[in-house]
């Protein structure tokens, strides 16, 4: 049986990467929230 999670770096970048976050208002909100918290990494890839 094929498993549900088939990792792909390209797919992951396109959905949760920095550019994807910057493309939407809620994504920008998320980045600003992480900046306010002082996160070492803004995106978790």
Curated annotation (Swiss-Prot):
Keywords: Ribonucleoprotein, Ribosomal protein. InterPro entries: Ribosomal_bL34, Ribosomal_bL34_CS. GO terms for cellular component: ribonucleoprotein complex; ribosome. GO terms for molecular function: structural constituent of ribosome. GO terms for biological process: translation. Residues 1-45 are annotated as: Disordered. Residues 1-14, 31-45 have a biased composition (Basic residues). Coiled coil: none annotated. It holds the Pfam family Ribosomal_L34. It comes from the Bacteria. Belongs to the bacterial ribosomal protein bL34 family. This is Large ribosomal subunit protein bL34. The gene is rpmH.
